[in-house]
Amino acid sequence: MAHVAKKYKAAAEKVDRTKRYKLDEAMSLVKQTATKKFDETVDASINLGVDPKHADQVVRGAVVLPHGMGKTVRLAVFAKGDKAKEAQEAGADIVGAEDLAEKIQGGFMDFDKLIATPDMMGVVGRLGKILGPRGLMPNPKVGTVTMDLARAVKEQKAGKVEFRVEKAGIVHVPFGKASFDPDKLKANFSAIMEVIYKAKPQTAKGVYVKNVTLSTTMGPGIKVDLAELAAQHA
């Protein structure tokens, strides 16, 4: 543990907690502060000037990261007939209907994402207590309830990430791995921020993006220059 603490301290000393970093420098620091032997995930913590207690200020969405998430996504799809065939041809790992629901009720959870056609939501809805707590319930707002399965499957396989503002007005979203080149991390992060700026509720008052911090799984937080972000996404 002392060795771990020493490595974290050395990483943290590279970061000036009082400074807001330009994106290029922030992405470079993210890589420098990744100290674990495994390939750490890089996350953004985005503090928004919204009150999620009001339904019209719930910020949520999804974005296909230009450089993916650096991992293979196992995808399950609820569909029948021609739509089941469409999902299989697009690259879905598991495709089913009532049979898949029975497997999930029996404890099968060998997938990372779940998509369904609208007509299958009656079946999927019965799995709410299993899927909901795991964040796997399909939702039309993020494109996981759809008739366009070919597109949905390809997007998920390419590295589509979903986000939703939490109670404190914070969005947590992963955007790559510490092994990524800084330019790829920057492109993925910029794609997320583009969607978040566009998702600003009309009823939100004052400053919308109040703080942005980047970090690896076990690394220190790195604050981002908000003026640069605002200029890029004006």
Swiss-Prot record:
Tell me the InterPro entries matching this sequence. Ribosom_uL1_bac-type, Ribosomal_uL1, Ribosomal_uL1-like, Ribosomal_uL1/biogenesis, Ribosomal_uL1_3-a/b-sand, Ribosomal_uL1_CS
The record's listing under CDD domains reads:
Ribosomal_L1
Source species, domain of life: Bacteria
Tell me the subunit arrangement: Part of the 50S ribosomal subunit.
Q: What HAMAP family does the database record attribute to this sequence? A: Ribosomal_uL1_B
Describe the family membership recorded for this protein in Swiss-Prot or TrEMBL. Belongs to the universal ribosomal protein uL1 family.
Q: What is this protein called?
A: Large ribosomal subunit protein uL1
Source organism: Anaeromyxobacter sp. (strain K)
Q: Could you read off the lineage of the organism from its UniProt record?
A: Bacteria, Pseudomonadati, Myxococcota, Myxococcia, Myxococcales
The encoding gene: rplA
